[in-house]
Amino acid sequence: MIWKKKYTLEQMNLLSQNTAISHLAIQFSAQGENWLEATMPVDQRTIQPMGFLHGGLSVALAETIGSMAGFCCITENQFVLGLEINANHLRPVKQGIVTARATPIHLGTRTQVWQIEIKDQQDQLCCLSRLTLSVGNHE
């Protein structure tokens, strides 16, 4: 198991209250031995003018889930910060809920790399993202 911090999904959601994460209604929803999932609705908060899920908000979901996963893989005297994120938007989504799953590609002492897959309710891949995090130490 990769998790060094034993946060429950409820605790992760409480940490996110009164932030951009809660404004977008992102909810941490499931966790496995080496993955973390979150959901986000496709509604008036998350669509662009043409009525599809806004690509920037897919990236916000990817960075949210990847950063929380990274945070749970470090010790109490460490922190993570995003260095780079990219995303390939593969399929438009018009309504419903999307689910993001973050899995680690690399968990090093100074950097982490996470792959995030965002799927629609038909389990079709809509966005594929990669997030690189810097791992720092509190002094």
Curated annotation (Swiss-Prot):
Its top-level enzyme class, in one word, is hydrolase
Q: Which GO terms describe its cellular component?
A: cytosol
Q: Which Gene3D superfamilies match?
A: Hotdog Thioesterase
Q: Which GO terms describe its molecular function?
A: 1,4-dihydroxy-2-naphthoyl-CoA thioesterase activity
Keywords in UniProt for this one?
Hydrolase
Q: Give EC number(s), comma-separated.
A: 3.1.2.-
- Pfam annotation, one family: 4HBT
User: Has keyword Hydrolase?
Assistant: yes
Family, per entry: Belongs to the thioesterase PaaI family.
Q: Which NCBIfam families match?
A: unchar_dom_1
- The name this protein goes by in its record: Putative esterase PM0788
